């Protein structure tokens, strides 16, 4: 059962790469999901990092700056108009 769950998480991470799956569980205010290298776990290469971390700029709802939330709890790149 654990194997099926892990594979499902891995596939989910591949198909929604921006802020998932750590964004799904949420980060505290002032923190956002950030791709860590090397990955902390095989199924979740993202971790919650502070907005004050060098090079990290968190936007609303735990997404990185320049991204907005999607209905499935992930993040997507903002489309610039003009």
UniProtKB/Swiss-Prot annotation:
Signal peptide (residue range): 1-21
Subcellular location: Secreted
Tissue specificity field: Expressed by the venom gland.
Keyword annotations: Disulfide bond, Ion channel impairing toxin, Secreted, Signal, Toxin
One GO MF term: ion channel regulator activity
Keyword Zinc: no
Cystine pairs: 22-33, 27-48, 32-61, 58-69, 63-75
Domain of life: Eukaryota
GO cellular component, one term: extracellular region
Protein name: U17-hexatoxin-Hi1a
Organism: Hadronyche infensa
